[in-house]
Amino acid sequence: MSDHAVNTPVHAARAHGHRAPRAEFYVYFAVILLGAFPVAFVSWIVSTIRHRRLPKRGPFASAWFDAKAITPLIFRA
């Protein structure tokens, strides 16, 4: 008989879910951040002019948020 409790989905999820980010992840993150910053800056300027008040997030925070959301999607694919 085989032991089915050894590689349960719970153990597999724990083993693969908490990997330490590698250098490749940081390189992709930096490239995406550098690409997202000009777009976020223009968007921030347009929003400031349009609404006549400063948005809650600045352009760097917005670009950081976008890079933080996009980079893991690349590694999951």
From Swiss-Prot:
It comes from the Bacteria. The keyword Secreted does not apply. One of its GO terms (biological process) is photosynthesis. Keywords: Bacteriochlorophyll biosynthesis, Chlorophyll biosynthesis, Photosynthesis. InterPro entries: PufQ_cyt-su. Belongs to the PufQ family. Required for bacteriochlorophyll biosynthesis. Directly involved in the assembly of both the B875 and B800-850 pigment-protein complexes. This is Protein PufQ. It comes from Cereibacter sphaeroides (strain ATCC 17023 / DSM 158 / JCM 6121 / CCUG 31486 / LMG 2827 / NBRC 12203 / NCIMB 8253 / ATH 2.4.1.). The lineage of its organism: Bacteria, Pseudomonadati, Pseudomonadota, Alphaproteobacteria, Rhodobacterales. The gene is pufQ.
